Amino acid sequence: MAPTIRKSHPLLKIINGSFIDLPTPANISAWWNFGSLLGVCLIAQIATGLFLAMHYTADTSLAFSSVAHICRDVNNGWLLRNLHANGASFFFICIYFHIGRGLYYGSYLYKETWNIGVILLFLVMATAFVGYVLPWGQMSFWGATVITNLLSAAPYIGPDLVQWIWGGFSVDNSTLTRFFTFHFILPFIIAAASMIHLLFLHQTGSSNPTGLNSNLDKVSFHPYFSYKDLLGFVIMLGALASLSTFAPNLLGDPDNFTPANPLVTPPHIKPEWYFLFAYAILRSIPNKLGGVLALLLSIMVLFLMPIIHTSKLRSLMFRPIAKTFFWALIANTAILTWIGGQPVEDPFITIGQIASGLYFLIFVLLIPSLGLLENKLLKI
C-alpha cells in the first residue's frame, strides 16, 4: 500500500507529527487549550497589525492623527484597531492562564520548554510595551518616558543607555520610529521562538493533570483535541469580537485620547492592566535600582521554578497544602494588579509593599519548603 502523503512528504510529515498524529494524553483538560489559543492570538495580532501598519505613520507630528484616520476613514479600520488593541489583552489573559496551568500542574519540569516559554513572555511584554507607545497619546508618551527612564538606574552605563534607546535627550521622533520598527519585527521573532517552544515540547510530549506518566493512555491529537481546541477558539474569538464591538475602550486609558504633550503630565501614569502587577512591585520599593531589579525578578523568578521544585509529586492535584498557597499566589497577584492602578498614597503603598513581599516569599521560600514538608508527611 502506498504511504500516506502526510506521513512521507518532508514538510507535511512535520505538520502531521505536530498537529495530526501527535500522541496526546487522553486526560488533559481545557487548561491545555491555552497554548493553541496563544497561537491564534499571535496570528490574529500579526494579521490585524499588518493592515494597521499599512495606514500608520511613525512620526510624532502624524502618529496620533494617523490612528484617528484609521478609525475614521479606512474601511473597517476602527474594527482592525479595536481587535488589535483588545487582542493584546486577550493575549495576556491566555498567557497568564497558560503560566498558571504550568505552575499548578508542574509543567515547568520540562526545563527547556519552560525556559523558552519565560523568554517568550519577556518578548511578548516588550512587544506590548513598544506597541502601546505608537498611538502617541498622553499615556503612550509618558509611559515610554517613565519606563525607559528606569534603565538610567543601571550603574555606570545607565544614563548613556537611556539616551541610546531614546536616540536623543528625550522621548521624541527617533524613539517613536525605532519603537515602531521593534513592534513590527518582534512578533515574527515570537513566532520563531514559539516553534522552538513546540519543538522542545514534542521531545517529551504534554504533561497531564495527574502529573503521572501517560504513555499507557494516549490518543491522536486530531480529531480529539483539534476539535476541543476549536471550541476554545470560538469562545475566545467570540469574546474578543464582542469586546471590540460593544465596549472597545473598556480596558484602555482615557488619557490616551489626548495627543502627547511633553509639557503636561497626566495625573496618574500607569501601564495597561496586564503590566499592573509588575508595576506595583516596581513602585513598592522606594529605591530606583531596587525597584527595577524587583520588576525584572518578578518575571525572572519563573526561571527558578524547575530548580526549587522539591516535591516528589509533580502536580498540585495531590498536594493540598501547596494547592492552598498556589491560590494565595493568584489572589496576591490580583491584589498587586489592583494596587498598580491606584495612586501612590496610603493605604495603597503599604498594601503594595506587603503584597510584593508575599509574592517573592511564596515563590522563593514557601514553594520549596512546602514540597519538603509534604514529602515528609507522605513519607516519600
UniProtKB/Swiss-Prot annotation:
Transmembrane segments: 34-54, 78-99, 114-134, 179-199, 227-247, 289-309, 321-341, 348-368
Membrane topology value: Multi-pass membrane protein
Protein name: Cytochrome b
GO CC term (a single one): respiratory chain complex III
Binding-site list for heme b b562: H84, H183
Gene name as annotated: mt-cyb
The family this protein is said to belong to: Belongs to the cytochrome b family.
Compartment(s) where it occurs, according to its Swiss-Prot or TrEMBL record: Mitochondrion inner membrane
Keywords: Electron transport, Heme, Iron, Membrane, Metal-binding, Mitochondrion, Mitochondrion inner membrane, Respiratory chain, Transmembrane, Transmembrane helix, Transport, Ubiquinone
PANTHER family tied to this protein: CYTOCHROME B
Note describing how the cofactor binds: Binds 2 heme b groups non-covalently.
Miscellaneous comment in the UniProt entry for this protein: Heme 1 (or BL or b562) is low-potential and absorbs at about 562 nm, and heme 2 (or BH or b566) is high-potential and absorbs at about 566 nm.
Species assigned in the record: Pelophylax nigromaculatus
